[in-house]
Amino acid sequence: MNYLVVIDTNVLISALLSKHSDSATVQVLNAVFDGTIIPVFNDEILAEYDNVLHRPKFKFPDANIQSLLDTMKTYGVFAKQLITNEILPEPKDLVFYEVVMAKQDENAYLVTGNSKHFPKKPFIVTPNELLDIMK
């Protein structure tokens, strides 16, 4: 089974920085590469991924960043934002929420390490919760 998932940037960063191959964030990222997770995004989300992944403090090689972004674009799904009246504690997170809302008719999830930044909804999950759903 495949799962449509909007992936918050913090999940990608955590996966790439993790030294544990069995961590939940690494397993989520691996599921993107094996096709179990179909990433959902728009241009703003891709730009955020690119911007954050290129921050000097992370020292991720350009080739690795490009490979990840290319995989997301090739195997993922582009979605327009569904404009909502939601007020979030972190306004920059609104795009992730609105993109997942646009795909609710297809049972999409938003996976984040910062669930407190989003409304409590059953489709907004932590990496561990997503892995449980995928079992």
What do these predicted regions represent?
Residues 58-59:
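Membrane interface segments of multi-pass transport proteins and intramembrane proteases
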Residues 105-135:
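Acidic, PIN/NYN-like endoribonuclease modules and their adjacent C-terminal/linker elements
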Residues 86-92, 115-116:
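Acidic, metal-coordinating catalytic cores used for nucleic-acid/nucleotide bond scission
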Residues 12-13, 47, 117-119:
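Short, active-site-adjacent cap segments at secondary-structure transitions
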Residues 90-109:
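Acidic, metal-associated active-site segment
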Residues 43-46, 64-88:
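Acidic catalytic patch
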Residues 6-7, 24-54:
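PIN/NYN-family metal-dependent endoribonuclease catalytic core
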Residues 1-20:
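Metal-dependent nucleic-acid phosphoesterase active-site entry motif
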